[in-house]
Amino acid sequence: MFFYTSTSFRSSISKLTRKSKDGYESVVKDVCDALGSMDDSFLRETNDRIRQEQNFRIVKLRVKNSHQNLPKNDAFRLIYWVSTKSDNLVLLSIYPKRGPLGINNLTNDEFKRLLEEMLREKCDSILQKVDVADNLKVIDEACSW
């Protein structure tokens, strides 16, 4: 599976890592551990599907917050777009369920905005390819597939 990040995801993860005193400092490791421990078919076929089309799905994945030792249902929500036709997965957003930056759920308009932004960034070749085995290290700054 090839992993990419959108601008919204990079902004979300940056905001969370700056709030280390609020218990979010493990977010990068937790995302990498969650994605690295799942096989491609699981990432495509399971989890909470938010939207499903012929060529892609938008999925919500519960990610454990290892720093706060919370159960997955109280930790992070990772929103991603995954192709059903290729090995491409784009991280769209992440947010905590609890804490000062906690969000209960994203609205339909927010999901629509994330999808539109990702499609625009794909066309403009500004998605970043990352390595989930190396703490989301950027492999390619401006890429398209």
Where are these regions (language model features)?
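N-terminal targeting/export leaders
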Residues: 31-43, 55, 133, 141-145
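Enriched for short, Lys/Arg-rich terminal
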Residues: 66-145
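Residue-level signal for secondary-structure boundary elements
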Residues: 21, 39-43, 123-127
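Acidic side chains
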Residues: 30, 40-44, 48, 99, ...
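A short, surface-exposed loop/turn module that caps and links secondary-structure elements
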Residues: 39-69
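N-terminal "first-domain core" detector
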Residues: 1-37
